[in-house]
C-alpha cells in the first residue's frame, strides 16, 4: 500500500506566513485583503524586478493610457508600493524618500483604480496601512534585525498612523533613545 504525501502548495505557505504575520502585527485582515496580499506576494516572487522600477513614472504614465492597460498599470503601481513600503522599506531610504511616499502613491493608485472601476480597490486604498504593517511583521518573523530603524518608524507612524511603526517606536524609546516616552504614550493613535 502506498501512502499519499501531500506537499503544501506555495499558496498555502504564503497564506500561513501572512497569518503568522497578522498575529505578530496584531492586525487581522479580512479574507479578501488576506487573499489579495497572498496573490500579490506570489506574483512578486515570479517577477522580482517589480520593486526596481520607477513607480512615480509608471504612475504618471498610467494617465496616458486607457482601459485595461491603465487599470493594470495602476494596480501594479499600488502593488509595488505596498511591497516596497512593507517588505523593502530600505529601498525608500536608498531612493532618498520616506516610506510614507510609497504609502501615499500606492493608496492613490488604488483609489484612482477604485474611482474608475470600483471593485475592492477602495478597500485596498483604505486598508493599505494594515497590510503594510502585516508585511513589516512578516520581515521580522525570522530576523528581528529586520525592524525598520527607530527614526524611520517614528516618521512612518507620524505620516501614516502605522500601528506597527508606533509599537517599534515605543519599544525603541524604552531603550533610552532620544524620543520622549511621555510624548509617545500620550500620542493620538486614532490615525
Language-model segments: residues:
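Polar/charged low-complexity regulatory segments
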Residues: 1-191
Amino acid at each position: 500500500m502506498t501512502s499519499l504525501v501531500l506537499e503544501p502548495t506555495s499558496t498555502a505557505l504564503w497564506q500561513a506566513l501572512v497569518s503568522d504575520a497578522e498575529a505578530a502585527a496584531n492586525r487581522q485582515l479580512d479574507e479578501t485583503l488576506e487573499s489579495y496580499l497572498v496573490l500579490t506576494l506570489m506574483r512578486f516572487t515570479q517577477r522580482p524586478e517589480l520593486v526596481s522600477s520607477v513607480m512615480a513614472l509608471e504612475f504618471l504614465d498610467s494617465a496616458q493610457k486607457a482601459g485595461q492597460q491603465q487599470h493594470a498599470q495602476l494596480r501594479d503601481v499600488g502593488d509595488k508600493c505596498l511591497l516596497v513600503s512593507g517588505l523593502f522599506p530600505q529601498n525608500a531610504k536608498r531612493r532618498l524618500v520616506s516610506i510614507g511616499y510609497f504609502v501615499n502613491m500606492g493608496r492613490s493608485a488604488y483609489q484612482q483604480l477604485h474611482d474608475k472601476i470600483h471593485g475592492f480597490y477602495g478597500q485596498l486604498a483604505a486598508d493599505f496601512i494594515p497590510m503594510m504593517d502585516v508585511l513589516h511583521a512578516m520581515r521580522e518573523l525570522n530576523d528581528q534585525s529586520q525592524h525598520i530603524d527607530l527614526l524611520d518608524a517614528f516618521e512612518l507612524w507620524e505620516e501614516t498612523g502605522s500601528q506597527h511603526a508606533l509599537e517599534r517606536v515605543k519599544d525603541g524609546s524604552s531603550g533610552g533613545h532620544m524620543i520622549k516616552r511621555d510624548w509617545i504614550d500620550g500620542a493620538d493613535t486614532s490615525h
